[in-house]
Amino acid sequence: MDLFNVLKSEFLKLKKDTMFYIGTIITMLVPILVILKDKVISAPPKSAMDWVMTCCLVDFLIFSILSGLVITNLVQKEYQSGTLANILTSAVSRTAFVFSKVVIWFFWYFILLIYIEIVTVLGSKFIYPDEFSMEFVKIVIVMFTKFGLLSFITFIPLLWVTILQKKLFYPSVLVAIAFTGILLGGFNISLDMIFLASLIPWTAVSLISIYQVESPYIIIGITFITLIGIIGLFLSIQSINKQEQ
């Protein structure tokens, strides 16, 4: 079974995946609710950039946790339904299985990331018309894209956890919450902690995406983020290859 056929099968499975739809709907509602809150219920921050930072914090808090739930569900249902037995009997298809989960996960993640960016830009236009400009739009899109893509890479080890836990659910959920906590903790990095933050992949995401730091720290951060993604993928493939039917 090649990767293309596995991906085709994965897309067909999504039609009956309730958790996938729930995660998608909640993720789509959050940025809209933030806009409505600041426009109708309470006064928004004084500057558009402060508002964008709040949106980034709230959106990725929910998005990251739900992302963890989605990948957990994508893998766990294979164990619960017993369909993974067909994968485990074919040494060739095990790696394709891992890559197919990453591709489906990333496809879902990237589409929603673009959606969040669009809603945030429209919200800033709606709430802060005087500060809105194409330069502002560029800043928001670059920041959210960097933060989103880099944070996705740091969450790849979660796939390894979902494979290890098999039919269990909570271990990977707890790990997803922990990753999210560290990730968002990067929003409050002090100057004397920049070097340490660049060594920790999850805090390095904020360092690279939000803060204006010197290039050595950016290079260090990108290096460790890339390493954690590669390690997570390697461990996932190794774990699935070691499992018996």
Locate the predicted segments by residue.
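Hydrophobic core of alpha-helical transmembrane segments in multi-pass integral membrane proteins
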Residues: 26-35, 113-117, 121, 222-235
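Terminal transmembrane helical anchor/hairpin motif
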Residues: 37-50, 172-245
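Secretory targeting signals
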Residues: 31-67, 99-165, 169, 206-217
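Hydrophobic/aromatic residues in alpha-helical transmembrane segments
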Residues: 64-71, 84, 157-158, 201, ...
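Helix-loop-helix units of permease transmembrane domains in multi-pass membrane transporters
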Residues: 73-106
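Aromatic- and glycine-rich beta-strand/loop motifs that create alpha-glucan
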Residues: 1-24
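Hydrophobic alpha-helical transmembrane segments of multi-pass membrane transport/permease proteins
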Residues: 18-40, 55-70, 171-186, 227-230
